[in-house]
Amino acid sequence: MIQTQKQIRTSMGYLLLAMLLICVLALSGCGTAQYTQESVQSEGGYTFTDAIGQEITVHNPQRVVSLMGSFSEIWILAGGADTLVGTSHDTVDNRDLGLPDDIAIVGTYQNPNIEEILALNPDLVLLSSETTRTDSHVALKDALQGAGITAAYFSVTHFEDYLNMLEICTDITGNKEAYHTTGVAVQERIAQIIADNTLEDEPSALLMVTYSGGIRAQNSDTMTGRMLSQLGCKNILDDYPSMLQDFSVEKIIETDPDYIFVIPMGNDDALAQKNLKENVESNPAWSSLTAVANDRYILLPKDLFLYKPNAVWDESYAYLAALLHQQAV
């Protein structure tokens, strides 16, 4: 039977408590971020290089629009709550940020409304450079810049990407204490979790995302895939990359992973599990898989593994570490 969040919450709590009591080393060996921060503060404003290579200069922005929920949260963490005038729908749907009721919603993160953005007269817009789901953001660049609005692009997949964006945002707001409390301190806790919990036997793992239209497997380049890899798991898609495009239950049965992790996408978890049952679990051989037979077929919570966890990224690592060690003893 697929395990849920409640079944392992106690184990995670003990692990998190232990991690929070330890002063630790800086996070290392996690790869490079997806864009390079090159920033300089001067009397003429604050200048940095964004995710699409633009040299961006900002001058104490007072009207900021963010087109992703995770970016809105980062801006708020950086001390910019009072200057956030507009955001995307997922910010209020998926996150509890304590935003005022009258904040402007300028479309979804996939389909932002340029007219509504321009009507807010922003001096800075935070956009995503990821073209897989948010190519509409890149398409807004000319319109925004043509209106004299600074359009800054970011790419956040892994923790170090979050840390880079947070550093830029706290440089802009001048709130460097926030960079240390919601960035560096989290980095240190992650480093300790990895150091204390990495598995040496490299158990194999399958990571899946299920949604109303089907099922998609993920490799070690994804947010959760990277965390599993850092904790010592071997993602089966790293050896079978064709499964990224051609999801195959038969290949899963052939490889027989030690762990199967599932992330539900969308607003209906019941529908996600129904989709799993109809498209995966209905195979007669499914129940005989090592992961299923040993209760290592696990549903992961969306708040830690679908949405960017930002200032609680260490909780995502601790959650996985608790799962992996719970099954190992």
Place the predicted regions along the sequence by residue.
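Short helix-initiation/N-cap motifs at beta->coil->alpha
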Residues: 50-51, 104-115, 240-249
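Short secondary-structure boundary segments
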Residues: 88, 129-130, 240, 263-267
